[in-house]
């Protein structure tokens, strides 16, 4: 399924507010609410829309630190790490990447001691580098049509 210009308009609305009623979306894009529902359903079935998420504030949830941690896996440790990383509550995003490091993780931590403890778990799998996030400059930027 290709994403036509009308579907992109609907996606723009949903990316801005996934809870926006279909009647409002329809008004904004110029079609009926049932037509919006049908298009959304087709995009869900085609895995264009893969889910709807709640954005929770890490600070309000009790986490004082957000960090970016890269891991350069030791020989033979990458595959086991790719399984174990799924079990870490601290990891909110994890990417396998090219370059000197194999992994980039976005993690949330309660405090400095928690960070130290988490890094201690990771060093079994490889060499880590940690950067503390100071501020979130771009957050959940909406996807736009490919040019």
Predicted regions, residues:
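A compositional/biophysical signature of low hydrophobicity enriched in polar/charged and small residues
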Residues: 1-147
């Amino acid at each position: 399924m290709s994403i036509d210009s009308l579907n992109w308009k609907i996606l723009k609305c949903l990316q801005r507010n996934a809870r926006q009623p279909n009647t409002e979306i329809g008004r904004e894009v110029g079609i009926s609410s049932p037509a919006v529902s049908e298009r959304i359903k087709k995009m869900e079935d085609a895995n264009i829309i893969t889910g709807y998420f709640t954005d929770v504030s890490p600070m309000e949830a009790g986490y004082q630190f957000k960090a970016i941690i890269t891991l350069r896996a030791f020989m033979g440790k990458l595959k086991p790490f790719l399984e174990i990383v799924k079990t870490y509550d601290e990891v909110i995003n994890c990417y396998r990447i090219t370059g000197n490091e194999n992994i980039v993780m976005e993690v949330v931590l309660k405090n400095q001691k928690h960070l130290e403890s988490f890094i201690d778990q990771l060093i079994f799998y490889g060499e880590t580098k940690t950067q503390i996030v100071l501020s979130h400059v771009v957050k959940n930027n909406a996807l736009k049509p490919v040019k």
